[in-house]
């Protein structure tokens, strides 16, 4: 322990000395009268429309036409060191999605504070345009905050807190990539646009290795809690979060491979969501996604996605999907997807879906 402390102390001292020298070399005058060194704010928005058909019993053919997402955002930088982003979701009930500022002067160490994505799983921070299929995996949805297994609503994988991250050990010619990526942060635990509900904070961390450019292998850990609000008939209830995840991703030359596994551990217990069904102590999920480029404008994805509510075959929900992405322009995409479900918790486990989605942004 003493050796580790000594190494960390020396590393921080070295980083501080490096920062001072860099500041002497190129520094701007700070002050309330300073109005320069600020980028022009970048404004943008995107819309994802959809048509969904389902032959699930009782689904009446599926939801039909809909608007999956409408989002608008603004981002920019000040002094090139401080970055900011605001993102609002306009579909459904309008609300703030992202709102943060990040000090990002050095690749090795940066600090982000506000409302933003939780550092759990590779897929969670992925833009919906780049997921490949029409929805996030159940690893992300059940374990990162898109309708959490504990009962938390759809927070888009986000929370409010502070995060430290960086990339270490330059590799390749001209520092083309870094060997190690780390993130560690502290969040409220209640999701977006919510105040903290207890004195505890969620701690989430990840350590990732990039042995070759584009290939990341990583592990994630999460320790925290979520508080279900009190109702007229029940007091507030606190649920522990104890989660781990491991996986790999490869993105290079338009080829994509992602695979991840996540599990609830150390007694994380979900609330009873449906009458007559147990509140399972253990759950896990896994997915594998492969994206193959056929042309510059055409890419095909295949995916296996599984969530086991009770960590057993009898409680599994599997989705097998194939999606064709027609990327006609950087800002225009059409997506056609077939999805086969095998949900063992339904009276009739097997059913089919066809999704058509349109993506446009500016």
What positions do the PLM features span?
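Outer membrane beta-barrel
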Residues: 30-192, 197-204, 208-217, 289-294, ...
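Outer-membrane beta-barrel "beta-signal"
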Residues: 326, 332-333, 350-362
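Outer-membrane beta-barrel proteins
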Residues: 54-56, 122-125, 136, 193-195, ...
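C-terminal hydrophobic structural anchor segments
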Residues: 291-335, 339-342
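Detector for outer-membrane/organellar transmembrane beta-barrel domains
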Residues: 208-310
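N-terminal periplasmic/intermembrane-space "pro-region" immediately following the signal or transit peptide
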Residues: 4-48
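A generic beta-sheet turn/junction motif
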Residues: 92, 250-254, 362
């Amino acid at each position: 322990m003493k050796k580790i402390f000594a190494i960390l102390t020396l590393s921080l001292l070295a980083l501080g000395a490096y920062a001072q020298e860099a500041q002497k070399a190129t520094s701007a005058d700070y002050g309330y009268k300073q109005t320069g060194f600020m980028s022009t704010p970048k404004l943008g928005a995107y819309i994802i429309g959809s048509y969904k058909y389902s032959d699930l019993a009782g689904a009446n053919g599926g939801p039909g036409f809909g608007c999956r997402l409408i989002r608008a955002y603004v981002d920019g930088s000040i002094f090139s060191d401080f970055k900011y982003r605001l993102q609002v979701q306009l579909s459904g009930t309008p609300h703030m999605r992202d709102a943060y500022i990040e000090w990002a002067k050095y690749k090795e160490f940066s600090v982000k504070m506000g409302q933003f994505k939780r550092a759990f799983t590779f897929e969670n921070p992925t833009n919906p345009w780049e997921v490949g299929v029409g929805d996030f995996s159940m690893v992300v949805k059940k374990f990162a905050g898109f309708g959490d297994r504990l009962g938390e609503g759809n927070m888009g994988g986000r929370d409010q807190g502070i995060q430290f991250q960086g990339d270490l050990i330059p590799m390749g010619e001209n520092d083309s990539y870094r060997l190690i990526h780390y993130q560690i942060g502290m969040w409220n635990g209640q999701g977006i646009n919510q105040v903290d509900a207890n004195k505890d904070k969620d701690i989430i961390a990840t350590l990732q290795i990039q042995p070759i450019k584009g290939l990341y292998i990583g592990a994630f850990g999460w320790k925290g809690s979520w508080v279900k609000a009190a109702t007229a008939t029940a007091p507030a209830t606190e649920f522990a979060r104890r989660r781990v995840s491991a996986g790999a991703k490869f993105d290079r030359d338009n080829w994509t491979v992602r695979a991840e596994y996540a599990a609830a551990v150390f007694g994380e217990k979900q609330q009873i969501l449906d009458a007559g069904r147990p509140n399972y102590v253990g759950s896990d999920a896994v997915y594998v996604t492969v994206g193959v480029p056929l042309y510059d404008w055409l890419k095909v994805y295949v995916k296996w996605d599984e969530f086991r509510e009770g960590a057993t075959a009898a409680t599994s929900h599997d989705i097998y999907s194939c999606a064709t992405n027609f990327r006609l322009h950087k800002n225009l995409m059409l997506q056609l997807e077939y999805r086969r479900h095998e949900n063992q918790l339904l009276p009739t486990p097997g059913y089919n879906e066809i999704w058509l989605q349109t993506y446009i942004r500016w």
